[in-house]
Amino acid sequence: MRDIRQVLERWGAWAANNYEDVTWSPIAAGFKGLIPEKVKSRPQCCDDDAMVICGCIARLYRNNRDLHDLLVDYYVLGETFMALARKHGCSDTCIGKRLHKAEGIVEGMLMMLGVRLEMDRYVERELPGGRTSVFYQRKNSLRS
């Protein structure tokens, strides 16, 4: 089972390095260093994985812009829970719950697509007892 937080962290680092060239610029309206360096130095996903995740993020934007903005602020721009809580006018606990909901939606979209990401070998989470997900075991056995 893939760890969606690690997946989104890698996607966020990819997006922060401006591979999309769509939404944000590293230098906008005279503000240098809009994207913090700590975000740029993280491990990234490949372009193919990023395009799949961008599709999920775009669908989330269409259906729930608040959750989309929360994911972008946290994973791309690297804002903290406290900064997000001030921005959204709620507690950091509330931000954690909203972020968890947004992560779950993206994870569900990836599951429904049934795609295997290149980064899965790095972000796979073990289930209790040292087993991997049954979903991946079945999928791999069908390919053999």
UniProtKB/Swiss-Prot annotation:
Disulfide bonds: none annotated. The keyword Lyase does not apply. InterPro entries: Phage_933W_GpQ. GO terms for molecular function: DNA binding. Transmembrane segments: none annotated. One of its GO terms (biological process) is negative regulation of termination of DNA-templated transcription. It comes from the Viruses. Positively regulates expression of some phage genes. Bacterial host RNA polymerase modified by antitermination proteins transcribes through termination sites that otherwise prevent expression of the regulated genes. This is Antitermination protein Q. It comes from Escherichia phage 933W. The gene is Q.
